[in-house]
């Protein structure tokens, strides 16, 4: 699968580690090494990171003091903080990285320009897409799906703490059943929390497969993309 183009979505919470907040540099280093293994296999990589380890727009707006729009913009800025951290970690690992933001902040990153992003990918650079879609009321899952479609990614990978999609939370229910493969319709209609409905609908409309996999299993991303080993993931298509 040489020259495959993928977009990997990491949750912000994943960066927090055991502390549950902030950024754990050991996890950053682990992720950057996983990304490096993809680049060395001639896989073009785009990245979107959430901001939940710093702030969530919905949570910030819960008591009505902060408006939802402002809360969401705060969340977008949190993804930029995570993006800078990821850029540093990937560069420390020896990768060439560019970050593009949906909200202009030229002192920190390039503005999101689709053609430029694609050119970076073609040159073997990792591209981090930050600040969500630039609009409130849209999740970073939706931003990841949107960017994946825009850059022509063959697949979007949602890197999580579990090895796929289950019919219920495997951390709470010992009898949870793993769903190896499911349709977009199942993901939408059965209320299975793969991504939010907007993300899944966008993926469905553009025939973009969604892979859900365990980000903490070393070598898992490369094994899935290069060897087609689907044992440690689920696919929505």
Curated annotation (Swiss-Prot):
Pathway of action: Pyrimidine metabolism; CTP biosynthesis via de novo pathway; UDP from UMP (UMPK route): step 1/1
Identification of the protein by name: Uridylate kinase
Regulation: Allosterically activated by GTP. Inhibited by UTP.
Localization per record: Cytoplasm
Gene3D superfamilies in the cross-refs: Acetylglutamate kinase-like
Task of the protein: Catalyzes the reversible phosphorylation of UMP to UDP.
GO biological process: 'de novo' CTP biosynthetic process; UDP biosynthetic process
Region span, Involved in allosteric activation by GTP: 17-22
Keyword Transferase: yes
Gene: pyrH
Cellular component, GO annotation: cytosol
InterPro entries, sorted: AceGlu_kinase-like_sf, Asp/Glu/Uridylate_kinase, Uridylate_kinase, Uridylate_kinase_bac
Species of origin: Sulfurimonas denitrificans (strain ATCC 33889 / DSM 1251)
Protein's UniProt keywords contain Chloroplast: no
């Amino acid at each position: 699968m040489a020259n495959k183009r993928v977009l990997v979505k990491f949750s912000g919470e994943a960066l927090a580690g055991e502390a549950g907040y902030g950024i754990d540099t050991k996890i950053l280093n682990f992720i950057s090494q996983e990304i490096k293994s993809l680049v060395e296999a001639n896989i073009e990589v785009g990245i979107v990171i959430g901001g939940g380890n710093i702030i969530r727009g919905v949570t910030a707006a819960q008591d009505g003091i902060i408006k939802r729009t402002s809360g969401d913009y705060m969340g977008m800025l949190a993804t930029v903080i995570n993006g800078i951290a990821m850029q540093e970690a990937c560069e420390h690992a020896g990768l060439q990285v560019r970050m593009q933001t949906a909200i202009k902040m030229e002192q920190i990153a390039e503005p999101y320009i689709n053609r430029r992003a694609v050119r970076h990918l073609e040159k073997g650079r990792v591209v981090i897409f930050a600040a969500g879609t630039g609009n409130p009321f849209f999740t970073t899952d939706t931003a990841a799906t949107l960017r994946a479609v825009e850059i022509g990614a063959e697949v979007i990978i949602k890197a999580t703490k579990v090895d796929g999609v289950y019919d219920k939370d495997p951390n709470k229910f010992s009898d949870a059943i793993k769903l190896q493969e499911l349709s977009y319709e199942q993901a939408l209609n059965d209320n299975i929390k793969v991504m939010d409905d907007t993300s899944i609908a966008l993926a469905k409309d553009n025939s973009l497969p969604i892979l859900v996999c365990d980000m903490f299993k070393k070598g898992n991303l490369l094994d899935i993309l290069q060897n087609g080993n689907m044992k440690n993931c689920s696919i929505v298509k």
